Amino acid sequence: MKELSSAQIRQMWLDFWKSKGHCVEPSANLVPVNDPTLLWINSGVATLKKYFDGSVIPENPRITNAQKSIRTNDIENVGKTARHHTMFEMLGNFSIGDYFRDEAIEWGFELLTSPEWFDFPKDKLYMTYYPDDKDSYNRWIACGVEPSHLVPIEDNFWEIGAGPSGPDTEIFFDRGEDFDPENIGLRLLAEDIENDRYIEIWNIVLSQFNADPAVPRSEYKELPNKNIDTGAGLERLAAVMQGAKTNFETDLFMPIIREVEKLSGKTYDPDGDNMSFKVIADHIRALSFAIGDGALPGNEGRGYVLRRLLRRAVMHGRRLGINETFLYKLVLTVGQIMESYYPEVLEKRDFIEKIVKREEETFARTIDAGSGHLDSLLAQLKAEGKDTLEGKDIFKLYDTYGFPVELTEELAEDAGYKIDHEGFKSAMKEQQDRARAAVVKGGSMGMQNETLAGIVEESRFEYDTYSLESSLSVIIADNERTEAVSEGQALLVFAQTPFYAEMGGQVADTGRIKNDKGDTVAEVVDVQKAPNGQPLHTVNVLASLSVGTNYTLEINKERRLAVEKNHTATHLLHAALHNVIGEHATQAGSLNEEEFLRFDFTHFEAVSNEELRHIEQEVNEQIWNALTITTTETDVETAKEMGAMALFGEKYGKVVRVVQIGNYSVELCGGTHLNNSSEIGLFKIVKEEGIGSGTRRIIAVTGRQAFEAYRNQEDALKEIAATVKAPQLKDAAAKVQALSDSLRDFQKENAELKEKAAAAAAGDVFKDVQEAKGVRFIASQVDVADAGALRTFADNWKQKDYSDVLVLVAAIGEKVNVLVASKTKDVHAGNMIKELAPIVAGRGGGKPDMAMAGGSDASKIAELLAAVAETV
C-alpha cells in the first residue's frame, strides 16, 4: 500500500476517474444553493441531485469530485472518537444513467488494489452487501475477492423518501488484531459493532429503483436510468494509508495540532487525554471553510452551528490553558494544509480571521456573563440550603452561555455542590427533540421524469429579439408527448424562441403565441429549462397547436424591459456593495421581477443608513454616467482574466457570457440586460434587512417604481408638514423636533408629578406596619397607573427603615400586579412571590431583594394580602 499525502490521495482519486472518462466537478460551496432541505452541503452527491432526479441532464454522465462537506448532528462526539468530524471531504464517482454495477465494482477494486494506484493489499479488504443483491456478490467474486471477505448486511439498502434508491456495497480496511483486543473478528462487521479494526473507506450505492413509501420495497419500480453514487472519506483514507491510529494523526490535522501545542505549551499525547486538541483542530477547519463560503456566526440556523463550534473550541482552548483569543491564529495553517485544492481559505484569510477573532472577543464577554450567572446560582443554592445544581440551570449555562458541562461541574464541585446530570440530559433531549421537529424533512432526490428527460430536440434562445417565427418541435400534455393539443395547459418546445427561461434570479418571460392568421393560440405563463437545457414553455392553450407548424412567438416587451432595468441595476448594486462595505459582500441569492429587485448578500451586520446612502448614490451615479453595456461569449478562464465576477453557487459550462457595464461592473451572467445604464432611469433602496445569520437583503426599485417611491415619500412629507404647520417642506423636520422636545418636557414634568403623588401616597402606605414571626412587614393594595409605579413605591421604601418586607398589590386594567421587596436575609422575595402569586391566578419570580408577578384574578387581592403574614 502506498503511503501518500492527503493531497496526493485526492489527486490520484480524481486522476483515476478521469482516466475512466469522468469529468471533474469542482467542490461546491458549503452553503446549499436553492435547496431548503439542507442546512449544509453534507455529502458528495448533495450538489448533484438535479442530475439524479433527471431535472437536468449533465454534459458528461460520468462525474467525479472531491466535495467539502459539513455534518453537525453529532458535535458532542467530535474529539472523543477517532473518526468523528464536523467538516470532512467526500471523494466520489458518479454515473448518471451510464455505467452501472459491474464497472463501479471493477473500477473501484482496480483503484484500491492496482500497484499503479493506491496498491491496497487485497487480503486487507472486506466488503458488505445487501443479501438480495447477488449480482454485487458475484461481481466481487469475479474481481478475485474471497467469499470469506464478503459479508451480507440487511441494512445495506439506501433510500431517503421517494426517489432514487437501491442496494449499496461498502468497503472496509482491516487494521488487524491489534485493534480487536477481544478477538471478535468478522462479527464486528456482521453485527455492526462499533470498532477500530474494520474501517469503512468507501460506499458504493447502486441506484436502480424509484423508492415509493406507499409500497413494499419488493414492488419498487426500476429507474428508467440507473445511477451510481459513491463516497469515500478522504480523512479515513489518509489515516489508513498514512498508518495513523486516528484521522487526527494525519497531515490534515497534525499541523493544526502542532500550532495548538505552541499556543498552549502543552504536548499532544496520542494515547492520553487529547480531546481538546482534536476539538480545536476539527472545529477551526469547519469554521474557516464555512465562513469563507459566506456563512457567519449567529443565533439561528447555520450561524448558530458556527457559534456553537467556535465556543466549544474556545472552551477547550481554556482547558489547555489558552485564555486569550487564539483560534483566528490557526486560519493560516488550515489554509496552507488545503491550499492545493482549496485556495479560497488563504484568499479570504483576512476576512475569516477578522470574523473568528471578533466572535472570540464577543464570547469572552459572554463567558464573564456566564460566570456571573453561575455565581448567582450557587449563591441561591447556599441561601436555600440546597446542595445540587439543577439540570435545567446547567443546560442554560451550556446552551445560552456556551459553558461545557465539565466546566460547570468543576466550578460547582470546587464550591461544594453536586451536579444534576440526569436533569441536564433530560433538558438536552428536549432541545434535540425540538430541533428534530423543526428540521425540514428532505434529502430525497425526487422522482425521475422520463418524459422531460427524453426531450432531445434542439432549441435556441435568441437574446436580441422580442418576436420571431419558429417551428413547434415538442408538445407535452398530461406528462405525455403528443402531436397536437387544442385545450388545457401544455408544455411546448420550439426550434428557437425569444422567451427567456427563468434562471440566475431573472424571472421568465410571458407573452403570446400566434398562428399564421395572427390569432393568439396560446398564452405563455412560464418558461423553465428542460433537463437537456431547452426552454420549456408552459402555456394556456386557446386554439389548436400541432408539431411541425410554424408560429409567431411574442414576449411581453414592456415586462421584459422592466425586468431588465432591475437585472442591470442588480449588477450595479453588487459592485457598489463591494466598494462600500467590502468584497466579502458576495451574492447569496437574487430575484429580478417586473416590479422590484431583491438582492441577498453575505455581511456580518446591518448596513448603516450612511452606507445605504452611499450605495444608492453610487448606483445612481453609474446610471447617470450612461455606461455602455456589452456582452461577450468566451471561456471561463478568459472571462476571469477580464475581471468577471463568478456568482455564488453557479456552475458554468465551457462557454460563458460576460456582461460588462462600462468599466464599473463585469460579471458572468446568462440573463438579459439593457443596452445602456441610463435606461434604468432611477434606483432607490426601499428596504434593508437580515434574513438569517450573516445574510442581509436589499430590496430596491428602478425606473417608474423608483419615481413612485420618491413621490410617495414626498406626499407623506407634505402631510407631516401640514400637520405640524411648517411653512415649507424643508422646515418640517425642525418643527417635528420642536414638538418632540416639548412633548419630552411635558412627559418629564408629568413623571415628576406622578413621583410626588406616589411619595405622598407612600407616606400613608408605609404607616401601616405589621409583624409576624419577628419580621416587620407592610402589605397594601395601591392605586397606580402602571407596574413602574410599584417600583417607585419600593424605591421610596428602601430609603428609610419602614419595615423588613414590603408587599404591594395593584389592579391595573384586567390584570393584577404584585411586588415583594425584602431587606432581610430571612425572607427571599423571589420565593415569597412564588407562594403569593398563585392566589391571584398569577406567576412570577425574582431576586432575593426584589420580585414581581402578574395575575388575572383581582377578586382574590384581599386573600393575598391576608396570606402575607403566613409567608414571611
UniProtKB/Swiss-Prot annotation:
<keyword id="KW-0547">Nucleotide-binding</keyword>
<keyword id="KW-0030">Aminoacyl-tRNA synthetase</keyword>
<dbReference type="InterPro" id="IPR018165">
    <property type="entry name" value="Ala-tRNA-synth_IIc_core"/>
</dbReference>
<keyword id="KW-0648">Protein biosynthesis</keyword>
<dbReference type="GO" id="GO:0006419">
    <property type="term" value="P:alanyl-tRNA aminoacylation"/>
</dbReference>
<dbReference type="InterPro" id="IPR050058">
    <property type="entry name" value="Ala-tRNA_ligase"/>
</dbReference>
<keyword id="KW-0862">Zinc</keyword>
<keyword id="KW-0963">Cytoplasm</keyword>
<dbReference type="GO" id="GO:0004813">
    <property type="term" value="F:alanine-tRNA ligase activity"/>
</dbReference>
<dbReference type="GO" id="GO:0016740">
    <property type="term" value="F:transferase activity"/>
</dbReference>
<dbReference type="InterPro" id="IPR009000">
    <property type="entry name" value="Transl_B-barrel_sf"/>
</dbReference>
<comment type="function">
    <text>Catalyzes the attachment of alanine to tRNA(Ala) in a two-step reaction: alanine is first activated by ATP to form Ala-AMP and then transferred to the acceptor end of tRNA(Ala). Also edits incorrectly charged Ser-tRNA(Ala) and Gly-tRNA(Ala) via its editing domain.</text>
</comment>
<dbReference type="InterPro" id="IPR023033">
    <property type="entry name" value="Ala_tRNA_ligase_euk/bac"/>
</dbReference>
<keyword id="KW-0067">ATP-binding</keyword>
<feature type="binding site">
    <location>
        <position position="673"/>
    </location>
    <ligand>
        <name>Zn(2+)</name>
    </ligand>
</feature>
<dbReference type="InterPro" id="IPR012947">
    <property type="entry name" value="tRNA_SAD"/>
</dbReference>
<comment type="similarity">
    <text>Belongs to the class-II aminoacyl-tRNA synthetase family.</text>
</comment>
<dbReference type="InterPro" id="IPR003156">
    <property type="entry name" value="DHHA1_dom"/>
</dbReference>
<dbReference type="InterPro" id="IPR018163">
    <property type="entry name" value="Thr/Ala-tRNA-synth_IIc_edit"/>
</dbReference>
<feature type="binding site">
    <location>
        <position position="669"/>
    </location>
    <ligand>
        <name>Zn(2+)</name>
    </ligand>
</feature>
<protein>
    <recommendedName>
        <fullName>Alanine--tRNA ligase</fullName>
        <ecNumber>6.1.1.7</ecNumber>
    </recommendedName>
</protein>
<keyword id="KW-0436">Ligase</keyword>
<dbReference type="GO" id="GO:0002161">
    <property type="term" value="F:aminoacyl-tRNA deacylase activity"/>
</dbReference>
<keyword id="KW-0820">tRNA-binding</keyword>
<keyword id="KW-0694">RNA-binding</keyword>
<dbReference type="GO" id="GO:0140096">
    <property type="term" value="F:catalytic activity, acting on a protein"/>
</dbReference>
<feature type="binding site">
    <location>
        <position position="571"/>
    </location>
    <ligand>
        <name>Zn(2+)</name>
    </ligand>
</feature>
<dbReference type="GO" id="GO:0005829">
    <property type="term" value="C:cytosol"/>
</dbReference>
<dbReference type="InterPro" id="IPR045864">
    <property type="entry name" value="aa-tRNA-synth_II/BPL/LPL"/>
</dbReference>
<dbReference type="InterPro" id="IPR018164">
    <property type="entry name" value="Ala-tRNA-synth_IIc_N"/>
</dbReference>
<dbReference type="Pfam" id="PF01411">
    <property type="entry name" value="tRNA-synt_2c"/>
</dbReference>
<dbReference type="GO" id="GO:0005524">
    <property type="term" value="F:ATP binding"/>
</dbReference>
<dbReference type="InterPro" id="IPR018162">
    <property type="entry name" value="Ala-tRNA-ligase_IIc_anticod-bd"/>
</dbReference>
<keyword id="KW-0479">Metal-binding</keyword>
<feature type="binding site">
    <location>
        <position position="567"/>
    </location>
    <ligand>
        <name>Zn(2+)</name>
    </ligand>
</feature>
<dbReference type="InterPro" id="IPR002318">
    <property type="entry name" value="Ala-tRNA-lgiase_IIc"/>
</dbReference>
<dbReference type="GO" id="GO:0008270">
    <property type="term" value="F:zinc ion binding"/>
</dbReference>
<dbReference type="Pfam" id="PF02272">
    <property type="entry name" value="DHHA1"/>
</dbReference>
<dbReference type="GO" id="GO:0000049">
    <property type="term" value="F:tRNA binding"/>
</dbReference>
<dbReference type="Pfam" id="PF07973">
    <property type="entry name" value="tRNA_SAD"/>
</dbReference>
